[in-house]
Regions:
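Nucleotide-activated chemistry modules centered on ATP-dependent adenylation/adenylyltransferase
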Residues: 3-204
Length: 204
């Protein structure tokens, strides 16, 4: 609001929200007068896709959510003729994982092949996002992703303190733990199955 932006907050609900994350959305949007849209994924379809990815034993088990978020955000932006998607991605706290720890989170071809092999349902309502769709939204619809936190010194601890003090924001316990699934993946699953401890990258 201080920047004078006319913001539409978009929540992609994949069924794994922590209670704190849901309340945080309300605590931020309502007092600031931010318009809010929720894109709810089909739970039966989405959990079947997630189960397929787990069965495939690839490391990057968050591919379904990563693709769905990009797909939903661009669809909402196109629907409302919005030209800029503001991302919280930043150089200060993101992009820290070793290359061997992750894979392209936008590989829709991989996801479709995994679902075809291990899944029981078709991807009928899943908001896809692939290379051709990225070109369409970027060059035809002129939609750009802006990493706004890279344009000024970003201090995560100070940002969290401001959110807590001014908007009654509550911490959910860890990096990306706003999702119950992500907290399970990063704190247990990837550590036990692949010996990957995200804390090593985060703390270093």
């Amino acid at each position: 609001n201080k920047l004078g932006l006319r913001t539409l907050a978009v929540h992609v609900d994949n069924g794994w929200n922590s209670e704190e994350s849901v309340q945080n959305i309300k605590n931020i949007c309502e007092p600031l007068g931010i318009d809010y849209a929720s894109h709810v994924l089909d739970w039966e379809e989405f959990k079947d896709i997630q189960l397929s990815v787990l069965k495939s034993s690839i490391v990057e088990v968050e591919i379904p959510t990563d693709i769905a978020v990009l797909g939903a955000l661009h669809r909402v932006a196109a629907k409302h003729k919005i030209k800029f998607i503001l991302s919280g991605g930043n150089y200060a706290t993101e992009g820290i994982l070793p290359q061997k720890w992750f894979y392209d989170p936008k590989d829709l071809k991989l996801l479709k092949n995994i679902q075809k092999r291990f899944g029981t349902k078709k991807m009928k309502t899943f908001p896809s996002f692939n290379f051709l769709e990225e070109i369409y939204y970027k060059f035809i619809k002129k939609i750009r992703i802006v990493y706004i936190l890279n344009y000024f010194p970003f201090d995560k601890e100070k940002a969290m303190a401001v959110l807590k003090e001014e908007l009654n924001w509550k911490y959910y316990g860890g990096k990306h733990y706003e999702s119950k699934f992500t907290s399970f993946v990063q704190s247990y699953y990837q550590f036990k199955k692949f010996n990957l401890d995200y804390r090593r990258a985060t703390f270093s």
